[in-house]
Each structure stands twice: as structure tokens, then as C-alpha cells.
């Protein structure tokens, strides 16, 4: 099935790269399965995966140009999605021939992790990153043994610094991996704070 990736991100085909990235952040935060109630999680997961498909295609100039050419073609659209045909295929596929649910979710999490780390850096002076770190410190204490750059030790609250997205613990865990291990209520709170910050930021786009 040929999917309208511009519609999925709520942007026009004329959207700039910056507008595409902003739209992805907004849509990914809105649909992230960890931000919604358990009853809405299945639907959110489906939407989150579609949002990540769209960003994968539209964030790359070459893939976007190819997608635009196929969208404009008067010939019948391919039955398989553009994402399925251009993304490296996993070993296991769904019965429909596309990537399996597990692969799509793993891909979505991996792509979102990059943006999550970026948002951690962007909000380090606005309290969200510090709130994240305070939660981590409360939950795990000194056992995590976080290291940032060349400074070892446990870093909680404001001591976490401005580069939390780069932090690894002694076992090589990224900040996003730590986030994924948080209780559901804390994950939802962090994602909602990120979304609120994005919507209230000075730079917003209207590409509808």
C-alpha cells in the first residue's frame, strides 16, 4: 500500500528539512506508546511506527526525491509500502511480505532514540533533563554508576550537565535505554514534558 508520508506528519510536500524534523518530533511524542494509557497503546504503537516510517523516508533527500517521483506517477502505485522497499529488509517478515511488527518497532525505537537524546540536550537548561536525572537517581541511586565524558560517578539532578543524551552507565546503557526501564508513569511524564516544551518553543512551523 502506498502511504502518504506527508499527511502522516501533517506537512505539505514543500516542507523544508527543518519543518520535517519538527513535525517528526511532535508526531513521535504525540503517538509514543509510553505516553498514552494502556487501553490506547496498541493504536498508538501503530501510529508511532507510521510516523517513524514517514520520517525515515522524508528526512533523507535521496529517498524523499524517489518517493516524490513515485507519488507523482500516474501509473498504479506499488502494493508494498515505500518504506518496505527502501529499508534494509529483516530476516523475518510479516505475512503481507513487509517488515515484521517486531522489526518495525525496533526500528522506530532506534530512530526515536536519536531525537530523544537531542531533546535531552535542548532542554537541559529548562528542567526536563534535570527532572529525568532526578527520577533516575531516586529509582536507582549509586548502583547505576553513570559516567559522562571523563567524569565518573553518580550524577543526579542539576549535576547531570547539558549532555545527558551522551551519558552511558558502566554497562554501556544510553540515556534512552535508562528511560525505557523507568516505570510507566514516569515515562509518560517525561514524554509529556518534552511535548509541552516543543509546542511552547519559540520556533514552530505551520505546514498544513
Curated annotation (Swiss-Prot):
Annotated Gene Ontology cellular component terms: cytoplasm; endoplasmic reticulum; endoplasmic reticulum membrane; nucleus
Ranges annotated as spanning the membrane: 127-147
Major localisation: endoplasmic reticulum
Ranges annotated as biased composition (Low complexity): 88-100
One Pfam family matching this protein: DnaJ
Entry keyword annotation includes Isomerase: no
Residue ranges of the region described as Disordered: 67-100
Gene3D superfamilies reported for this sequence: DnaJ domain
GO MF annotation terms: Hsp70 protein binding; protein folding chaperone; protein-folding chaperone binding; unfolded protein binding
PROSITE patterns reported in the protein's UniProt record: DNAJ_2
Mode of membrane association: Single-pass membrane protein
InterPro entries: DnaJ_domain (IPR001623), J_dom_sf (IPR036869)
Domain of life: Eukaryota
Any one of the GO BP annotations: chaperone-mediated protein folding
Protein name as annotated: Uncharacterized J domain-containing protein C63.13
Taxonomic source organism: Schizosaccharomyces pombe (strain 972 / ATCC 24843) (Fission yeast)
Amino acid at each position: 500500500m502506498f502511504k502518504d508520508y506527508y499527511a502522516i506528519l501533517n506537512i505539505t510536500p514543500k516542507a523544508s528539512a527543518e519543518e520535517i524534523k519538527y513535525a517528526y518530533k511532535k508526531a513521535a511524542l504525540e503517538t509514543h506508546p509510553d505516553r498514552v494509557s494502556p487501553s490506547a497503546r496498541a493504536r498508538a504503537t501503530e501510529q508511532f511506527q507510521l510516523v517513524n516510517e514517514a520520517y525515515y523516508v522524508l528526512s533523507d533527500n535521496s529517498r524523499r526525491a524517489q518517493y516524490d517521483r513515485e507519488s507523482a506517477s500516474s501509473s498504479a502505485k506499488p502494493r508494498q509500502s515505500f518504506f518496505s522497499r527502501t529499508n534494509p529488509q529483516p530476516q523475518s517478515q510479516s505475512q503481507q511480505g513487509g517488515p515484521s511488527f517486531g522489526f518495525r518497532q525496533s526500528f522506530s525505537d532506534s530512530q526515536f532514540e536519536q531525537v530523544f537524546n537531542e531533546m535531552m540536550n535542548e532542554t537541559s537548561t529548562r528542567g526536563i533533563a534535570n527532572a529525568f536525572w532526578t527520577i533516575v537517581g531516586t529509582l536507582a541511586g549509586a548502583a547505576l554508576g553513570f559516567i559522562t565524558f571523563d567524569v565518573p560517578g553518580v550524577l543526579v539532578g542539576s549535576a547531570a550537565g547539558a549532555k545527558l543524551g551522551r551519558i552511558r552507565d558502566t554497562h554501556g546503557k544510553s540515556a534512552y535505554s535508562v528511560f525505557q526501564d523507568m516505570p510507566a508513569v514516569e515515562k509518560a511524564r517525561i514524554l509529556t514534558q518534552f511535548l509541552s516544551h516543543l509546542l511552547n518553543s519559540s520556533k514552530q512551523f505551520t505546514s498544513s
